[in-house]
Amino acid sequence: RVLFRSMRGQSRDYDQWAELTGDAAWRWEHCLPAFRQHENHWRLDAANAAQASAEFKALHGHGGEWRVERQRLRWDILDAFAQAAQQAGIPATDDFNRGTNEGVGYFEVNQKDGWRWNTAKAFLRPTCYGRPNFELWTSAQATRVLTEKQADGSLRCTGVQVWTGEEMVTAHAQQEVILSAGAVNSPQILQLSGMGPAALLRQHGIDVRLDLPGVGANLQDHLQIRAVYKVQNVATLNTLANSLVGKAKIGLEYLLKRSGPMSMAPSQLGAFTRSRPDLPWPNIEYHVQPLSLEAFGEPLHDFPAFTASVCNLNPTSRGSVTIKNADFRSAPAIAPNYLSTPEDRQVAADSLRITRHIVAQPALARYRPEEYKPGPQYQSDEELARLAGDIATTIFHPVGTTRMGRVDDPLAEIG
């Protein structure tokens, strides 16, 4: 939930997991009850529930930990993009979480009364902070998991080595250790603990506890290709935030109403569609933003513009995460290998053409959109795939480096 959008996967994704693992518990119909149990959807509040359809009630929940609300801000430029997408053949939707994501509409968000709703607020504070068996260490870094070899040759995890910022301490496990440090830090911790590709571990002088070639391999990430269009005669965040008066208005609106740009998700409008008409399911996702910049961390442009980011939902490119030495303080080497397969390059080129097709629709004509990135002079597949890499960046969805799998999968860490 990096962008605090409330988003489930497509039912097809869960069904594929079940097929790949041989475990029917991953199927959509078996995951849906858990989604509903933990959801607290605004459309099922007492004031709104009468308007909710029976189909919606069967897909969503109320009273759970995760608050889901509609966004508290709309933009004319985003409304126009949504209309243009419909004119280009993408249907409208008011619910991306019904099992098929296809359509264009505003994302719903994990907020409560304009405040971001996160894991700490939803789970830790109400259920964990008062428990005698719960202790949270902050500003601490797990450096290694500790293991003992059993009589049958297997390894048993006995604890975790932790750097507190001042000293190294050991947390001993009485029952189990759950490693959940993300797609970058989980493989780093395992490799530092002697579990990973044997050649890599020996290269850095680490005792091989378990040769697991898959640890750190199979890195996958969503690459957002950020097409930027200059516009006229319409407000965007660029124009609002590039003046002291505009910044003051933004701050006051949030202070007084908990609405406005400070309450918004970075990407407010979304769309799921297909890069080719013969595909059975949507394979690309748009995040449309009423703003633009040269790169993350840089100032907004001083001209009005919007960004239509598009990403391949199922990339075939694979990367890796590997330690550079045996020091836990050293960041690992991350090689995402974006756009390294012909399929991913073709999807990238096709996605930029779909963006152009949407922007060329009548609904946006009044704002005179002008392609700023990648630039209308680039037309061939090769040019568009190359420029896609130049204007793209991670959308912070890395997965796959400590993957679960079937018992007979040699690259899985857990079978």
Q: Whereabouts are the PLM-identified features?
A:
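Periplasmic solute-binding protein
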Residues: 4-19, 194
